[in-house]
Amino acid sequence: MGLSSAAAGEGPQLCVFDLRRGQQEGQELDKILFFHPTDCPILLQLSVIGLCEGIITFARIFSPDDDCEVIESEKHSHVFYQAEADIWMVLVVEKNKDIESTWRCGALQGILKEVHSLFTMFHGPIRTLLDRQPSAELARGHLRTFFTDYLSDFNAGKKIQLPTFRDCLKERGTVQMLTISREVALEVQSLTTVLGSCLGNVMCQSLVLFEDLLVSTTLPPDDTLNLYTYAILRLTPRALLSNATSWSYLRKGTSVHAGPTSSSSNGTASVERPLQREKLYKGKDGFVAAGSTTSEVRGAVAWVPILWFQQAEDRMHLCVYQHKNITILLLIPASSLINGDDGIAHVKRHLLENASQNIVTLELKLSRGWGGENAYHVGGYRYLLVDPDRKVSRASPPGKVTTLSKDSLLSLNRLREEIDLEKSRAKRSDSCHDKDFEVCIRAKNNAWVIAKVTRGRELYMALEKAGETLLYASTAIEKFSNRYCEGAFSTD
């Protein structure tokens, strides 16, 4: 496996390739759709992908019905994800003796799943792009700019910093919900009804966020997750503030080049690079706008991208409105928007005229009842709750997780790795039934690290300065489950 890692010392390698392409001798380069780093020598790219293809083929001999997920060698980990039929994504990361670089392969695979889901939401399936233009230049162009902009979030100086053991109490690929009272729920329902009628008889869909938490959605779970993920990355007030910081930094002389950005024929901002951080900001009217490359002369232009959803039958225009800590993501069926920009303007007017008071009232009530960044802190516990079926999670605030010792975090990260393996084995042996697990490990510094999986729901926690008996750990789980999980993890 040495060939795959000749240049890995420069950082992780991420590649996307199509096994249906480049099958003839001399055409191997045709199967490469994306490779990071982009300046990696072609021969090295071919050797990495050739090795990955060999591993996939070899694994299928022994397990034809299950995809290869991870291959560990002495110096590297290869994390695989078959994003679409015969279209593979592989992340190659170098192992080293630096404990700070310790990762969990399940978390790395989560990155591959996330970027593919986001890409598909904006550009459609990769296979569709390849069928539309068999030369693959269209697909390669979109993949290059989109993946480059996505990976920029992991930049640490000149290198990419992937999630490490310090992120073991986070779960990528889930939504974090805001808990609301019955009174507030009625306000949310009223607002959702108004948003749904923004286009008259045609029903619009919507997501409502408060800060970085989901308040309501009218979309199915998979589509909700993808749009929520994008909102957290680029659209919430916190994300837009980060966008502005990035833009200021770039204006001072540092630039990132990943390909051209164009404008569409109707004057709206191009969505060729929806993850380009410095382009988006909140306009004076409250709607998110895009600054053009000549914004000093022309000003901002409308930003209404078209999205592809997995479970919706129609493509949707996305319109984003903000009021203080509230973010409204309004989705308008593309087939129902006959007049283009005029139709979008009509929807915006309807929102401002009919929903403004609802939004102001809801924001006030949510702000009054909001406990701040530590709202979901539970004294004595550092925890992560995951419901994979609903794609929902809740976790201790990041600031509280940082108080855990390195040993506790490393122990919990290793435990999560073991649970990932057990879940994978259980799924292969019986995909129709969830297997329950409970593991309590005594770690250093009088700590317990705990994992419990019950009826598909998962609980991970670390308890420091804790009693040394197993009864102490079991009692702590029971108390937490009964008070915060409606008894979902209780033994009774």
Swiss-Prot record:
Biased composition (Polar residues): 260-269
Oxidoreductase listed as a keyword: no
InterPro entries: Ccz1, CCZ1/INTU/HSP4_longin_1
Pfam families xrefs: Intu_longin_1
A molecular function GO annotation: guanyl-nucleotide exchange factor activity
Entry superkingdom: Eukaryota
BP-aspect Gene Ontology terms: vesicle-mediated transport
Keyword annotations of the record: Endosome, Guanine-nucleotide releasing factor
Compartments where located: Endosome; Prevacuolar compartment
GO cellular component terms given for this protein: intracellular membrane-bounded organelle; Mon1-Ccz1 complex
Region (Disordered): 255-275
Family: Belongs to the CCZ1 family.
Summary of the function given for this chain in its UniProt record: Plays an important role in membrane trafficking through the secretory apparatus. In complex with MON1, acts as a guanine exchange factor (GEF) for Rab7 protein family. Promotes the exchange of GDP to GTP, converting it from an inactive GDP-bound form into an active GTP-bound form. The active form is involved in protein trafficking from prevacuolar compartments (PVCs) to vacuoles. May serve as a linker between Rab5 and Rab7 protein families in PVCs and mediate PVC maturation.
Subunit annotation: Interacts with MON1.
Protein name: Vacuolar fusion protein CCZ1 homolog
Organism: Oryza sativa subsp. japonica (Rice)
Lineage, uppermost ranks: Eukaryota, Viridiplantae, Streptophyta, Embryophyta, Tracheophyta
